[in-house]
């Protein structure tokens, strides 16, 4: 139904919706002038919004699955997507909307363009929603992706897209090799995907240069920046089109929620899809594919993440400093073969990390830009798989779990956990040996974490 076919009563609601959109745009514009920490604390929830919510100074949890409408005209305008509404929580929800707006602003910090976000029920659902729309239609198509990626991403691409749907998967074995990226892309490439830094190997890639190559082939560059978070790196500023996060990890460090998000620049690169897909990808996904697939997040989980998000920058600063201390300790231990941490000069990729990973607004704190490299590291244990498992089993304070990004230190052996299902070939591509331990450093004092590692190595 076109707007000219609408009744005057429905058109009145459409006009009201335009006024609502204008007010929201004005709020976003004001918040984009604020510093990162201020955006993380407030998002777009201001005093006017609080007064409309019984004066609550925190974003309310809208737990009702459905919205009440004033009348049938209001319902018609809302369900035709002609005015802002949430209608049904599988499509949208006010609490989730506050989280989406905050994340879009944080990821766009320092970026001149416009962005939008779509929050999902998990990190993997965010990756699926960020990639699947580019695989529509028929004819030959391929994906170019870094092989240094999370096991779930590998399985989604290889099994679901590749083996089940016939999409050609072209793995880039060395993401720092621009020539390999270039030779893998062609006119049939639908999207380019990388993790920066990667999980668990912390592999690096030059986002700016890979973005140029992707755009030359009229396809978007999608970056999973879960490990860095917007506090340390914002790929949109480097030329990426879409950023995905598993919000369950470093952003929601309390570990009380599973969630994901895709954040996209407006007017992204893509040779396929309708104009709406390119113009505002996150909104397109939210109103159509997301609506139909249904990977919605609980509003209560959104509220938990909003509360964790408020301290993101200071938390990533602390945890990065702790991780550097622990990485240097590990590097000096004879029982350790290799330490993978982007902040070590011995790390393959240190130069890229040092150019790319900065504590946001660090110069405003100290007068100088501050490199911070995150709180995930990996180390291989001398003596092989058996010895690595012995060290792992001897941890007394560090938690053994497949999780990461917690405020508590957590370790896993990726070869038998996060990267088990992809098999030996996939693990070899990702460079995940059986004696690799992934450690995500928490907020404990680093001396105590080191003491636990030390006793595990000595036992």
Roles of regions detected by a PLM:
Residues 2-23, 107-113, 164-170, 183, ...:
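PLP-dependent enzyme catalytic core of the Aspartate aminotransferase-like
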Residues 2-52, 106, 112-334, 339-340:
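Conserved PLP-enzyme active-site core in the AAT-like
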Residues 28, 42-51, 335-437, 441, ...:
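Conserved C-terminal alpha-helix-loop-beta "cap" of PLP-dependent enzymes
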Residues 52, 58-105:
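A glycine-/small-polar-enriched, mobile loop at the entrance of the PLP active site in fold-type I
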Residues 63-67, 90, 121, 413-415, ...:
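Pocket-edge structural micro-motifs
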Residues 68-72, 269-270, 312, 384-387, ...:
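Short, acidic Gly/Pro/Ser/Thr-rich loop/turn segments
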Residues 84, 115, 258, 300-301, ...:
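Short amphipathic alpha-helical segments
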Residues 88-97, 116-120, 197-200, 442:
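Short acidic-aromatic active-site loops that bind/stabilize oxyanions
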């Amino acid at each position: 139904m076109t707007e000219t076919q609408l009744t005057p009563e429905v058109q009145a609601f459409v006009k009201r919706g335009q006024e609502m959109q204008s007010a929201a745009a004005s709020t976003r514009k004001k918040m984009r002038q604020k510093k990162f920490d201020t955006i993380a604390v407030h998002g777009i929830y201001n005093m006017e919004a609080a007064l409309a919510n019984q004066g609550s100074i925190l974003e309310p949890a809208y737990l009702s699955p459905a919205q009440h409408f004033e009348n049938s005209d209001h319902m018609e305008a809302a369900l035709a997507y002609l005015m802002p509404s949430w209608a049904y929580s599988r499509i949208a929800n006010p609490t989730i909307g506050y989280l989406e707006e905050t994340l879009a602003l944080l990821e766009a910090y320092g970026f001149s363009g416009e962005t939008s976000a779509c929050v999902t029920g998990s990190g993997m659902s965010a990756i699926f929603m960020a990639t699947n729309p580019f695989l529509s239609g028929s004819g030959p198509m391929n994906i170019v992706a870094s092989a240094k990626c999370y096991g779930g991403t590998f399985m989604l691409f290889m099994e679901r897209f590749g083996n089940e749907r016939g999409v050609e998967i072209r793995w880039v074995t060395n993401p720092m090799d621009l020539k390999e990226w270039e030779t893998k892309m062609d006119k049939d490439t639908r999207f380019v995907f990388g993790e920066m830094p990667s999980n668990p190997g912390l592999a690096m890639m030059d986002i700016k240069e890979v973005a140029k190559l992707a755009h030359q082939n009229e396809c978007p560059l999608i970056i999973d920046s879960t490990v860095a978070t917007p506090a340390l790196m914002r790929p949109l500023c480097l030329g990426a089109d879409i950023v995905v996060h598993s919000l369950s990890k470093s952003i929601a460090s309390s570990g009380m929620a599973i969630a994901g998000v895709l954040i996209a620049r407006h007017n992204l690169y893509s040779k396929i899809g309708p104009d709406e897909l390119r113009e505002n990808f996150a909104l397109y996904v939210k109103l159509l594919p997301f609506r139909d697939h249904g990977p919605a997040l609980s509003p209560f989980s959104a509220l938990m993440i909003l509360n964790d998000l408020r301290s993101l920058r200071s938390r990533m600063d602390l945890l990065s400093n702790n991780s550097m201390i622990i990485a240097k300790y590990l590097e000096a231990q004879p029982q350790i073969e290799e330490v993978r941490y982007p902040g070590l000069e011995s790390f393959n990729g240190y130069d890229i990390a040092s150019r790319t990973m900065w504590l946001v607004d660090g110069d405003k704190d100290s007068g100088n830009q501050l490199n911070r490299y995150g709180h995930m590291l990996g180390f291989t244990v001398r003596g092989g798989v058996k010895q690595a498992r012995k060290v792992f089993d001897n941890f007394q304070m560090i938690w053994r779990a497949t999780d990461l990004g917690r405020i508590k230190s957590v370790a896993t052996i990726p070869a038998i956990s996060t990267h088990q299902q992809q098999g030996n070939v996939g693990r070899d591509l990702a460079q995940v040996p059986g004696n690799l331990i992934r450690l995500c450093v928490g907020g404990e004092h680093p001396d105590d974490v080191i003491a636990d590692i030390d006793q595990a190595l000595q036992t």
